[in-house]
Amino acid sequence: MKLYLSILILTFWFCPPVFGQPQHVITRYSIEDGLPQQTITGITKDRNGYMWFTTWNGICRFDGHSFVTYRVLPGDSNDLATNRIDDIKIDAHNQLWLLDDENSLYRFSPENSKFDHFASQTAPVQNIFTLSDGDTWVFQTDGRLLRIRPNEETMDCLQILDSSSQVRSIISLVQNQDIIWIIADRGIYKFSKEDGKLTPILSSPNRFYSFRKWEGMFILGSDNGQLYIYDPKKDTHSILKFNTTNPLIRIKAYDSKHFLVIAENDGFFLTEGYQGEGTHYTTSNQLLSNQINALYEDNNQKHIWVAYKNTAMITRIKPFSTYYKHYQLKTQEYNNSQRSLSQDRNGRLWVFSKNEALNYYDEKADEFLLFSISRNSQESRQPRIKKIYFDNQNNLWIARQPKGLIKVSFKNDLFTLSVPDVKGYPSTNELRSIMEDADHNIWVGGKNGDIQVYDKDKNFLGFLNSTGKLSHQAEYLGAIYALLQDKEGNIWMGTRNEGIIKLVPQGKLNFQLKYYKANPADIFSLNCNFIFSLKEDKQGRIWVGTLGGGLNQITKDANGNERFIHSGNKLSDYPSRFSRIKNICIDHLDNIWLATTSGILLCRWSKDKLTYTPIVRNGNAKNSLSCDNVYDIFESSKHEIYVATFGGGLDKLTGFDEQGNGIFKNYSSPQMISNVPLTLAEDNEGNLWIPSENGLYRLFLENDSTEIYDNRFLPEGLLLTDSRACRLSNNEMLFGTDRGLLSIIPQQMKRNSYTSNLIITDIHINGEKKEPSYRSSGITLSHKENSFSINYETLDMKFPNKIEYAYRLKGFDNWNYVKNNRMAVYTNIPKGNYCFQVKSTNSDGVWSNKIKEISITILPSFWESIYGTILYFIIFILIVAISTYILFVIYKLRNRVAI
């Protein structure tokens, strides 16, 4: 299926924060993707996990990959008068109840793909109520209330209220075991399922407008500011009079001691239980208008959010205090339709009104922002929205007005991206080096040649300029590939092709700059200007890794001037093969490990002199270094050496053989680490973090298990670079990217363990589809049906193409890990009893413990059965008997001839 993925809208918390949209991916669906029609009128998710959409040309089911359409066609037997469906509800038996454009009711069974018209309907349907016992209740505009019992063949109907009851609206139905409480505009009725008896419980000359079950009580709002409180256990009621003459049109729970009551055109009340009306909020205190459109109490701070009928404003109120604040919605045109306020599973507050744009509350910016669903940022007007739906994975489904379906999949806010807070700073900001200084400032070197400095909270302080001070004007100093602060407080910067820059402190964030470059006339100058690594050992010696000149050591002459020791002077025995150094690692014994493009060079001290041990790939040795192109070497807190090789993946040094060759364990496999790790870093819990071209890996060293944070988590299009990762003193981890500084808190890096429903969709035997009865009873096949295919899928709507599967035919093979393949194929399976098992990850890559299985029995052929065995035995006996008889006859004939 051809799906159109929009460019991911990124949420980057700039320094200081610049507030953008939540990180998300937009997926657009159209007729080309399988929609029967582009006017979406209803959205819901069934109990299996399928998404259902109603349109003006039938209904369709979506499994995350493809749409299946159900509608009436010429000549078929479906009892559907029109394909224009306007609403949908799903009952406890996963049956779909549909209303067409004339409010005629139909039931659709997904199992047999059949539409049934509700023949007992006598007037347009006003409400559909689906209860947990499987019953569906229907209220018609003529005042009839009907109960429909679950039955696959027919729709058994019982009339509960007729038109003479004078009921004009049903507010709610409340089920309590065998009792159904009917909350109507004329009172409360009690229906017993056991004897079918209907009993009027509470009536009033006034009309009821609202209902809420609160702390075991039934609370009903009525005319003239009257609130009826009914106790179903005691069968008693009381009336609480509010200070208003207007109807109480809506009731919402606030907490266990308070609830909210909206009065028509007279604000709202925050009650103190049943003790009185409590606080009356109107324009006289904190409201902008007395005409309330919607109320919402958030889950985070228990604040009350108020939307109005006649203005595009929102008010936030902190109860039991004088605090309140008004907010302006970002909307291009205002209409007076009903607003809805709700929070998603991440606690984000959304405001929706039909045919307007969508707003959300940004807590850090403390304002409502427009949620953009435009194809590009240059569109002057946002598309209008007809309907929204949040599924249980927090995906936001949007039906556009007039046409189109959009899925918004939100990413967890696990990463923070920091860039210079400078207007016009380029979005391309490829980082090559990161360092935390002694004052906990963060230094960042970029490929574009500037030096960025942030404070410990990652607030941007400025760019280092050639005067040694910070400025908000970027200045080219050289592409900085290495950063080091030595024990004396000096900062050393290694550049690509510009040599070394030394920053000598002259005060707080004020430095004197000294430059060191290769000088052919001075043998004690730097021998190469391409600097890729800087390290200081325990003795205070600074080592320089160059890309072309090998290893340099910085020392001082008798006058205190820096000079460089390298292969051109006192390190004349340095192996020239290892001249291209990518990184330096100094272990706890002060051994120097050089990561080079030609392998590893281990430098050990022997009588104040370096000795060299090459460690390279040996194609004839199974456990040798996996690749000579080494990007990084890292010593863990347990003094274990890990090696990142470009193309060979991650290696761990486990020891040396008798010849001194390194013995390695490799971690690169489809289930573990990428074969292109860029750099290595360890968090405070002893886990290894490995940036790669396809994401950020975490390797749990205790059990060698891995996690990957790829484009499902990272901002879209963000690439990690091979800049050495940095662990801060507060245990945050910093990584370089092509767009800025990426930071994480390792303890907060968790993938969602949500488990979606894994189903076996169908089985094909010799190319023919099997009936779905196998789902409950298993399947028995003849010996001629020993080749089959099984289709399966996990109904995870977030990133369905990222779900991985594994299957096996227990008793025949082992687990097959097949990535995103959703079909298992078996051919020529011998007779026997088997169990097909399949498992999957969720969209975040977390494997589920739930295994879907189905028993499969392949019967033997007649010749393999017990009857065939008996027949074989009989034939054998006959052959033996006949042979014996023939031999006996021959023997007798011979005797006669002899006589």
What are these regions (language model features)?
Residues M1-L887:
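Carboxylate-rich, polar loop motifs that coordinate divalent cations or form catalytic acidic clusters
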